[in-house]
């Protein structure tokens, strides 16, 4: 991907949901990954509350930026650019990050890059396994997204092949965890219980796997309903619900469909690399089954460490560094948060700034830099 001689130093800000993430990278090398999570504040509601998330971002933003810079051992004045998630995500949460990034970039006189949350989830793998092959097939699975994407250039060309038509995989994990009274978030706890259960104990349905169904689309609403009804029927009959077997059987139904469709997409498109990202990619069974099926199909699997699969600022910085290295246009100062930013737009370029510098270094910038970071 980027020229090895060109390793831009970039700070990335991520606030699309409930994690305030700030990362610093130099090219494809991770220097810092600071995260402040508000997940505990949402747990009692059984899901993410947008207003709570936005307020938490406001409180955590400056301390998390300072922590990332300190962890990286770099000065803000040395940055080559500042990247921020512009979308998709929760509108209010995104706005906090975008506003902070604009303020820092303006004060420091640095180019600003508004980038796509989903494209960032793909690009983060560069920090783990080196430059992304082109093309790369990506399976992104999280609480808000379940998508199959083909990337020939992570900074400019990401093509959606399929997506969920109803619920995302992570959303289904959260729902079933609630029905089983296991708490929130559901992914990690179901993964834990499933390890002691039988994945073949209960035959739960696999959505959109018929011969006439969309080859690369996903559907988890029917599975979610089927599992919930099975549990309710057990309780109504006064029987004990086998939590471990239910967890394992439900989880197997999800990862079976995800991996089957991802491998098929690789074969159909002639791509020999599969990258899996997003919060659900931290699931141990998804990783194991994907590895098994990829090996059988002659496909190389790339999955970042679990900490880089969940939302973080490092992934935003990684994509920002790629934008700088490839001389992509920086964003304008009127960059706005876009809760439905399509993945076909890996970043939000400004108008008329082909070299990525939307402003000059005027007196205001120079004075601001001295005041803030002298």
From Swiss-Prot:
<feature type="compositionally biased region" description="Basic and acidic residues">
    <location>
        <begin position="359"/>
        <end position="374"/>
    </location>
</feature>
<dbReference type="GO" id="GO:0005737">
    <property type="term" value="C:cytoplasm"/>
</dbReference>
<dbReference type="GO" id="GO:0061711">
    <property type="term" value="F:N(6)-L-threonylcarbamoyladenine synthase activity"/>
</dbReference>
<feature type="binding site">
    <location>
        <position position="283"/>
    </location>
    <ligand>
        <name>substrate</name>
    </ligand>
</feature>
<dbReference type="InterPro" id="IPR017861">
    <property type="entry name" value="KAE1/TsaD"/>
</dbReference>
<feature type="binding site">
    <location>
        <position position="187"/>
    </location>
    <ligand>
        <name>substrate</name>
    </ligand>
</feature>
<feature type="binding site">
    <location>
        <position position="117"/>
    </location>
    <ligand>
        <name>Fe cation</name>
    </ligand>
</feature>
<comment type="function">
    <text>Required for the formation of a threonylcarbamoyl group on adenosine at position 37 (t(6)A37) in tRNAs that read codons beginning with adenine. Is involved in the transfer of the threonylcarbamoyl moiety of threonylcarbamoyl-AMP (TC-AMP) to the N6 group of A37, together with TsaE and TsaB. TsaD likely plays a direct catalytic role in this reaction.</text>
</comment>
<feature type="binding site">
    <location>
        <position position="311"/>
    </location>
    <ligand>
        <name>Fe cation</name>
    </ligand>
</feature>
<dbReference type="GO" id="GO:0002949">
    <property type="term" value="P:tRNA threonylcarbamoyladenosine modification"/>
</dbReference>
<keyword id="KW-0408">Iron</keyword>
<protein>
    <recommendedName>
        <fullName>tRNA N6-adenosine threonylcarbamoyltransferase</fullName>
        <ecNumber>2.3.1.234</ecNumber>
    </recommendedName>
</protein>
<dbReference type="GO" id="GO:0005506">
    <property type="term" value="F:iron ion binding"/>
</dbReference>
<keyword id="KW-0808">Transferase</keyword>
<keyword id="KW-0479">Metal-binding</keyword>
<feature type="compositionally biased region" description="Low complexity">
    <location>
        <begin position="337"/>
        <end position="352"/>
    </location>
</feature>
<dbReference type="InterPro" id="IPR000905">
    <property type="entry name" value="Gcp-like_dom"/>
</dbReference>
<keyword id="KW-0963">Cytoplasm</keyword>
<dbReference type="InterPro" id="IPR043129">
    <property type="entry name" value="ATPase_NBD"/>
</dbReference>
<keyword id="KW-0012">Acyltransferase</keyword>
<comment type="similarity">
    <text>Belongs to the KAE1 / TsaD family.</text>
</comment>
<feature type="binding site">
    <location>
        <begin position="140"/>
        <end position="144"/>
    </location>
    <ligand>
        <name>substrate</name>
    </ligand>
</feature>
<keyword id="KW-0819">tRNA processing</keyword>
<feature type="region of interest" description="Disordered">
    <location>
        <begin position="337"/>
        <end position="374"/>
    </location>
</feature>
<feature type="binding site">
    <location>
        <position position="191"/>
    </location>
    <ligand>
        <name>substrate</name>
    </ligand>
</feature>
<feature type="binding site">
    <location>
        <position position="121"/>
    </location>
    <ligand>
        <name>Fe cation</name>
    </ligand>
</feature>
<dbReference type="InterPro" id="IPR017860">
    <property type="entry name" value="Peptidase_M22_CS"/>
</dbReference>
<feature type="binding site">
    <location>
        <position position="174"/>
    </location>
    <ligand>
        <name>substrate</name>
    </ligand>
</feature>
<dbReference type="InterPro" id="IPR022450">
    <property type="entry name" value="TsaD"/>
</dbReference>
<dbReference type="Pfam" id="PF00814">
    <property type="entry name" value="TsaD"/>
</dbReference>
């Amino acid at each position: 991907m980027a020229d090895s001689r060109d390793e831009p130093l970039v700070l990335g800000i991520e606030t699309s949901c409930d994690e305030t993430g700030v990362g610093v990278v130099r090219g494809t090398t991770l220097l810092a990954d600071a995260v402040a999570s508000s997940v505990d504040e949402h747990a009692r509601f059984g899901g993410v509350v947008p207003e709570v998330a936005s307020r938490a971002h406001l409180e955590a933003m400056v301390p998390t930026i300072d922590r990332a810079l300190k962890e990286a051992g770099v000065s803000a004045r040395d940055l080559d650019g500042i990247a921020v998630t512009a979308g998709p995500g929760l509108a209010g949460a995104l706005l906090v990050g975008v506003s902070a990034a604009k303020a820092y970039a303006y004060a420091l006189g640095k180019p600003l890059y508004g980038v796509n949350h989903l494209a960032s989830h793909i690009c983060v793998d560069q920090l783990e396994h080196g430059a992304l092959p082109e093309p790369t097939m990506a399976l992104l699975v999280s609480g808000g997204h379940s998508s199959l994407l083909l990337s020939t250039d992570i900074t400019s060309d990401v093509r959606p092949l399929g997506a969920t038509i109803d619920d995302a995989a992570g959303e289904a994990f959260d729902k079933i965890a609630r029905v089983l009274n296991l708490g929130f978030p559901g992914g990690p706890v179901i993964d834990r219980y499933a390890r002691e259960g039988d994945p073949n104990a209960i035959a739960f349905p696999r959505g959109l796997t018929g011969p006439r169904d969309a080859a690369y689309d996903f559907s988890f609403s029917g599975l979610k309903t089927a599992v919930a009804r099975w549990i309710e029927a057990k309780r109504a009959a006064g029987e004990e619900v086998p939590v471990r077997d239910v967890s394992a059987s439900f989880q197997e139904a999800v990862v079976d469909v995800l991996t089957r469709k991802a491998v098929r997409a690789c074969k159909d498109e002639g791509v020999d690399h599969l990258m899996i990202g997003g919060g659900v990619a931290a699931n141990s069974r998804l990783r194991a089954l994907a590895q098994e099926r990829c090996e059988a199909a002659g496909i190389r699997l790339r999955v970042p460490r679990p900490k880089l699969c969940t939302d973080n600022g490092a992934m935003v910085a990684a994509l920002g560094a790629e934008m700088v290295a490839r001389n992509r246009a920086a964003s304008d100062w009127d960059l706005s948060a876009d809760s439905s930013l399509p993945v076909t737009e890996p970043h939000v370029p400004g108008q008329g700034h082909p070299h990525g510098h939307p402003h000059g270094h005027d007196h205001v910038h120079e004075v601001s830099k001295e005041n803030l970071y002298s």
